[in-house]
């Protein structure tokens, strides 16, 4: 059973509907105790890094997530801002500490690259390592992105990259911690396939 974490910073309905389409049982986790009932966790997210961390702290999710992910070793999937929160720090609205599951930081796309920010739309993935989420998904497949910030971390944690002005991290994997900068729930059949792969872990 997959817990969709409700910390007032994500569109849970679209993710829940996507899991329903593939027959994966899920529920909305509104408090830290709910995480104990799940065998997998999903952290969605839209909006500001700093505001999201503030919400997680106020709702008591930070220590609960660290217990479930780092000690209990439950698989977790972070989507978009959810992925960024897995890093050590972000700079949106000032320096802010993240969950620290993966070493690295979150920075904004450089405005001098003549890019439209946010990066919004379909983009091709370069899959770099065997990540169970990409089972049955071909390299160079397109997924849907909406973001102004991107992750900088060690290559060993990067499972896919995409190109927007320069190459950036499209997904991460470290042990049973998985994350996508793109939105699988908005990425049609391939997105559903990726969510199905996560549900089957």
From Swiss-Prot:
Residues 1-201 form the Glutamine amidotransferase type-1 domain. The active site is at residues 80, 183, 185. Pathway: Amino-acid biosynthesis; L-histidine biosynthesis; L-histidine from 5-phospho-alpha-D-ribose 1-diphosphate: step 5/9. InterPro entries: Class_I_gatase-like, GATASE, Imidazole-glycPsynth_HisH. One of its GO terms (cellular component) is cytoplasm. One of its GO terms (molecular function) is glutaminase activity. It is found in: Cytoplasm. Pfam families: GATase (PF00117). Keywords: Amino-acid biosynthesis, Cytoplasm, Glutamine amidotransferase, Histidine biosynthesis, Hydrolase, Lyase. GO terms for biological process: L-histidine biosynthetic process. PANTHER family: IMIDAZOLE GLYCEROL PHOSPHATE SYNTHASE SUBUNIT HISH (PTHR42701:SF1). IGPS catalyzes the conversion of PRFAR and glutamine to IGP, AICAR and glutamate. The HisH subunit provides the glutamine amidotransferase activity that produces the ammonia necessary to HisF for the synthesis of IGP and AICAR. This is Imidazole glycerol phosphate synthase subunit HisH 1.
């Amino acid at each position: 059973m997959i817990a969709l974490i409700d910390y007032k910073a994500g569109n849970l309905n679209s993710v829940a509907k996507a899991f329903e389409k593939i027959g994966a049982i899920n529920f909305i986790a509104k408090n830290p105790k709910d995480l104990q009932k799940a065998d997998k966790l999903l952290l969605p997210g839209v909006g500001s890094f700093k505001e999201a961390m503030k919400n997680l702290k106020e709702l008591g999710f930070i220590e609960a997530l660290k217990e479930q992910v780092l000690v209990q070793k439950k698989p977790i999937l972070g989507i978009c801002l959810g992925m960024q929160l897995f890093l050590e720090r972000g700079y949106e609205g000032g320096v802010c500490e993240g969950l620290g599951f993966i070493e690295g930081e979150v920075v904004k796309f450089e405005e001098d690259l003549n890019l439209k920010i946010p990066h919004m739309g379909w983009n091709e993935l370069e899959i770099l390592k065997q990540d169970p989420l990409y089972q049955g998904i071909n390299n160079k497949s397109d997924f849907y992105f909406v973001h102004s910030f991107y992750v900088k971390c060690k290559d060993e944690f990067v499972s896919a990259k995409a190109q927007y002005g320069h190459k950036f991290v499209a997904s991460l994997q470290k042990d049973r911690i998985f994350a996508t900068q793109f939105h699988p729930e908005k990425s049609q059949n391939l997105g559903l396939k990726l969510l199905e792969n996560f549900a089957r872990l």
